[in-house]
Regions:
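Noncatalytic linker/hinge segments flanking ATPase motor cores
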Residues: 63-65, 225, 264-275, 289-291, ...
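N-terminal signal-anchor/signal peptide hydrophobic helix marking the start
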Residues: 17-18, 383-391
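Structural motif
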Residues: 344, 478-480, 510
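Short periplasmic/luminal acceptor-recognition loop of GT-C membrane glycosyltransferases, typified by
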Residues: 27, 393-504
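Membrane-interfacial segments at transmembrane helix termini in multi-pass membrane proteins
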Residues: 371-385, 411
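Core SAM-dependent methyltransferase catalytic element
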Residues: 507-514
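Membrane-integral, polyisoprenol-dependent glycosyltransferases
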Residues: 2-377, 403, 441, 446
Length: 514
């Protein structure tokens, strides 16, 4: 088939200059403010892992604080290593790779929609919708794995959809499909393979037929491509670490994370059923229109089949086929693409908002289909959509200038460590009091005290602190303490303390032997 979805004629063509300006604005927005302090527990840890690999010139073994860190594959760390080499070790470099992956996701959406519909204007509108989607913008700005796996998954699905749109006449789209599955395996592990294969299987269930012969034959040379790409990291990791790698990375970080709440991220089954829609803002209304039309069409055809069916099994099967083959193949692929990650992560024992990001892409494509059709009929809707996209960018920029820096001051220890360094304490060890500060992983610059298992050491009492400073009488210690607990340190007669600074949430305290 030459195209796998159709649009009503009469849609206005948007000037080319507008799309060029919007693309430039998108690039600006996605890189703006990447120098802000690293936030949350994950960004500093992943940035520190990349730095340690960079400083050792080691592209294989991820470490945190010098201890093996087998939580995730290496793609994000590789991006950080390259960025550190170019820009130095800083926040911008840590986030540069994810920002590029965000732009890569948008470009993949454009290519997918362009080749699937032979309609460049629709492709432009789809890219606009993807670029201005809150979920994609937010996760493209963080040094984390969610957008890093979303890009190759999107590129892989683009390869398959382009292959379908060209009636399987070329092998290059399938080469891209298999290549980017390999990249996705390097980005976040086994879901890089499970999701594309699962999506294609579900899509063929929707259309009620087997994959074409050319695609099935391609598996014989496609899986070797996947293996070669993935083996660039998995093979040397196994050769270097053996069964330890298999146990920690495959068994614990994949199967135990999915089957249990070992990593303490529990949420109800329906968690992603409301997180996913929120991530599609500001295009949620158009996604709901698409979903509503699909449900109404399905119910209408079910009723029609029920009225004409003679009750036989053959009639029932034919009815299912009729229901499934009347809607756009692109729409069906997108629904399969949404459902596989949605159901997979809903069944998982561990749930974090970013997990569902791969499903945001097909959701916004479904919204873009409705937007393109409606804006072609109504100048008001056209202006409304353009205004919403630009307004989203304006809100993001204003937030990064006026809101996020104030929030970041209370959420990062960057300023606290900088104050201690400026006071001449830049070589002192750092530890937490009662609680650990994961934000310090990056900013403490290798000075964190650690337990034998590699975790940050936390002093549980003032007496324990006294034992440490007595043992190391010639060297003070920097303590990061929640502000409400600082009085336990300052009021104690067991140690000498000096509160260097606080950020409203955490204080950094110099602790000496009394």
């Amino acid at each position: 088939m030459a195209e796998i979805t159709k649009f009503e004629p009469g849609a206005q063509q948007t000037p080319r200059w507008f799309w060029l300006v919007f693309f430039a604005l998108t690039v600006f927005v996605y890189f703006f403010g990447l120098t802000l302090p690293l936030l949350g527990p994950d960004e500093p840890r992943y940035a520190e892992v990349g730095r340690e690999m960079f400083l050792r010139n080691d592209w294989i073994t991820p470490t945190l604080g010098g201890f093996n860190w087998f939580e995730k594959p290496a793609l994000l760390y590789w991006l950080e290593i390259v960025s550190y080499q170019i820009f130095g070790v800083n926040e911008f470099a840590a986030r540069c790779g994810p920002a590029l992956c965000g732009l890569g996701t948008i470009i993949s959406v454009w290519l997918l929609c362009r080749k699937a519909t032979s309609n460049s204007d629709f492709a432009n509108w789809s890219a606009l919708v993807a670029a201005s989607t809150v979920g994609i913008i937010a996760f493209s700005r963080g040094a984390s794995f969610d957008i890093v796996v979303t890009f190759p998954l999107t590129a892989a699905m683009a390869g398959f959809i382009i292959y379908r749109a060209r009636d399987g006449s070329r092998s290059l789209p399938l080469v891209c499909f298999y290549f980017f599955i390999g990249v996705a395996l390097l980005a976040k592990g086994l879901i890089g393979l499970l999701f594309p294969i699962g999506i294609i299987i579900l899509y063929h269930v929707f259309v009620w037929r087997l994959p074409d012969k050319r695609f099935l034959l391609s598996l014989s040379w496609g899986f070797p491509i996947i293996l070669v790409v993935a083996a660039s990291w998995y093979l040397p990791m196994y050769l270097r670490h053996g069964e330890t790698f298999i146990d920690e990375f495959i068994i614990q970080q994949h199967f135990q994370r999915f089957l249990s709440n070992k990593y303490q991220h529990p949420q109800p089954f329906i968690f992603f059923f409301w997180v996913l829609p929120l991530m599609t803002i500001p295009w949620l209304p158009f996604l709901l229109i698409s979903l509503g039309q699909t449900i109404r069409g399905f119910v209408k055809r079910i009723r029609k089949v029920s009225e004409t069916s003679d009750g036989s099994l053959k009639a029932s099967v034919d009815g299912v086929v009729e229901i499934q083959t009347r809607s756009s193949p692109l729409v069906k692929i997108c629904y399969a693409w949404v459902l596989i990650p949605l159901l997979f992560f809903s069944l998982s024992g561990s749930k974090l908002p970013g997990y569902i990001l791969p499903a945001v892409v097909p959701a916004v494509i479904l919204a873009a289909i409705q937007i393109y059709r409606l804006q072609g009929k109504s100048e008001t809707i056209r202006r409304l959509v353009l205004t919403a996209a630009i307004a989203t960018f304006v809100v993001v920029i204003c937030s990064l200038i006026f809101v996020v820096p104030r929030f970041a001051r209370h959420e990062t220890v960057k300023g606290l460590i900088a104050t201690a360094n400026a006071d001449g304490y830049n070589d002192l060890p750092v530890a937490g009091f009662i609680v650990a500060s994961h934000n310090a992983e990056f900013y403490a610059d290798g000075r964190l005290l650690r337990d034998s298992d590699g975790r940050q050491h936390r002093f549980g009492s003032v007496s324990e602190l006294k034992e440490y400073v007595d043992l190391h009488s010639d060297r003070p210690l920097l303590i990061l303490s929640p502000l409400e607990l600082v009085h336990h340190l300052t009021n104690s007669e067991l140690i000498r303390t000096d509160v260097l600074e606080d950020n409203g949430e955490v204080a950094i305290v110099l602790v000496r032997r009394r």
